[in-house]
Amino acid sequence: MGTGGQNGLRPGKGNTEGVKEGKGKTDEVTMTSNTDASASCQYRCIECNQEAKELYRDYNHGVLKITICKSCQKPVDKYIEYDPVIILINAILCKAQAYRHILFNTKINMHGKLCVFCLLCEAYLRWWQLQDSSQSIDPDDFIRYAKEWDFYRMFAIASLEQTAYFIGIFAFLWVERPIRAKEKLNFTLLLKALLLSSYGKLLLIPAVIWEHDYTPLCLRLIKVFVLTSNFQAIRVTLNINRKLAFLAILSGLLVESTMVYFFQRMEWAVGSDCAIYKSQDF
């Protein structure tokens, strides 16, 4: 079992060409191994955030052994043996280990789809609040088309506000970057982390469907949960302290609030009856 995880390479036999061919193959395999090793260093220990070359060693006959971190002497990623439901629960609890597992040690390519779906949920909430504030029993087709375009408008506004929120976070981290003078910031990974950590917005639809007296409170709690998830995602992705992550969130909220104020002034200037920004939670 000790040799199951290693592969040997033999040079050609019987002539010089075989030896040369074997050396050439050895060099090629060595270069490939170095490339794979550098690529595999993208794994992270979920406990101490140190880089790791592998998560586990695969031996013969399906025998797996979890890699132990050289820094903290703990398993690099214990979640590879966990059920996805357990991982989701730990992510909901905003555990840093679960976030590191999802962001660094798994391949998830649903960031764009999740972002669009969350924006649709938020647009539906705004559209629902708009229709609730201006009820009309006129069955005219023009009224129905106007309501449909209101939904598209809410989707565009939600997209712009979320973009402003992300720009505020990125701008703060970019300005703060020379002060820290550390490794280069991976804004692509940070964007994916922020998109994934915004999954709490999916709870907007159940909150609207099962409407009750505590719906406004539920919407505020969902907002707090999303901000907390974004806060933890920034901490885990950039490996920064809580103070910087908190200031980054505040910067994003400041830019987003500026965008909301701009839309308020714009709607007031054109005389629109769209006043949902004054009473909505998102």
UniProtKB/Swiss-Prot annotation:
Entry keyword annotation includes Endoplasmic reticulum: yes
Gene giving rise to this polypeptide: ARV1
Family annotation (InterPro entries): Arv1
Matching PANTHER family: ARV1 (PTHR14467), PROTEIN ARV1 (PTHR14467:SF0)
Topology versus the membrane: Multi-pass membrane protein
Subcellular location: Endoplasmic reticulum membrane
Native organism taxonomy: Eukaryota, Metazoa, Chordata, Craniata, Vertebrata
Organism: Bos taurus
Listed name of the protein: Protein ARV1
Renumbered residue ranges of the record's region Disordered: 1-31
GO cellular component: cortical endoplasmic reticulum; endoplasmic reticulum membrane; Golgi apparatus
Task of the protein: Plays a role as a mediator in the endoplasmic reticulum (ER) cholesterol and bile acid homeostasis. Participates in sterol transport out of the ER and distribution into plasma membranes.
TM spans (from-to): 155-175, 189-209, 244-264
Biased composition (Basic and acidic residues): 18-28
Biological processes per GO annotation: cholesterol metabolic process; intracellular sterol transport; regulation of cholesterol metabolic process; regulation of intracellular cholesterol transport; regulation of plasma membrane sterol distribution; sphingolipid metabolic process; sterol metabolic process
Protein family (similarity comment): Belongs to the ARV1 family.
Assigned keywords, A-Z: Cholesterol metabolism, Endoplasmic reticulum, Lipid metabolism, Lipid transport, Membrane, Steroid metabolism, Sterol metabolism, Transmembrane, Transmembrane helix, Transport
